[in-house]
Amino acid sequence: MQGTERREERVLRDRKGRVARKLRVSVTDRCNFACLFCMPEKDKISWIPKEEILTFEEIERIVGVLASLGIEKVRITGGEPLLRRDLEELVDKIASIRSIRSVDMTTNGWHLERKAEELRRAGLRGVTVSLHSLRSDRFAKISGVDALPRVLRGIDRALGVGLNPVKINSVAIRGYNDDEILELIEYARERRISIRFIEFMPLDGLGMWNYDRVVPGKEIIETASRVYPLQPMGRGASETSSTWRFKDGRGDLGLITPMSEPFCDDCDRIRLTADGKLLSCLFDTEYHDLRHVVRNGGTQKDLADRIVDAVWKKPDGVGYMPWIKDGWAKPRNMNAIGG
């Protein structure tokens, strides 16, 4: 029967036939920024208790089982991952797992200037830095921290030590930074690095999301193409972004469009939260507790069975979530999921 075949294959296949190959590991829900599209108001923040956060050894064990089931690429996230002390030790542990092909990280860049070299030595391949404005006052308004020069130094340091790829992610929000699209593109082009614009998603802690604030990817590419000759490269299988290459060879532009053009049909990503919950979809409302298995004597097979079952139940996609179709945001924070 179908259920039996799923278990015998021992791969992370869901009901739609999608196979998970990429994992995002959140190592903390804490962040020293307060980006308005991510974090709730300070008096409404409830951090995960320290004793509930997975240890590096527990993460290593879970990732090892996931690797045996076909996970090949790992991205370390937060909150802000570099708030986790000695993160390079975890990078080394994950990079040493035989079938893991790459370990990358997404960061706000605050600690990147200081940590880039040792992370690279530990086995970090590349880094994606969140950068939503190049204007100091606006950067502070969006992120809650006056830190633009420090973040920019972190990006340059990452390039200097040889992390590759270095990418920029920018969330485009109508009325906040949609007039900076060309400035952000030019900044990335000067460094010949990729920049990806992300549509504003209904996962903000402040509850400010609505469709009127979403800048569709089509609008972004129209803005860019009026200035820069672009060559469409399409969207690779299971990739989150559609890509355009600048014809003069100075980097490329990506669009991540979960709202206007969802890419759920061939999604190959799953997420592990900082407190050990497996999330098969960014917009899912069902968590699968792996920490309980790890801390209560579960065997490797127990862990694998729980993971395979969780992935099998992966939702069809964002377009099928009734709370999104109805146009309102779920009261759930991106920092707690893992960005």
PLM features per residue range, with description:
Residues 2-23, 186-190, 200-339:
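Auxiliary Fe-S-binding modules of radical SAM enzymes
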Residues 15-54:
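Canonical Radical SAM [4Fe-4S] cluster-binding loop centered on the CxxxCxxC motif
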Residues 22, 26, 75, 106, ...:
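Conserved beta-strand segments that form the floor/walls of ligand-binding pockets within enzyme
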Residues 15, 51-54, 79, 104, ...:
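Pocket-edge positions in alpha/beta enzyme catalytic cores
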Residues 56-76, 83-196:
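Radical SAM/AdoMet-radical enzyme domain recognition
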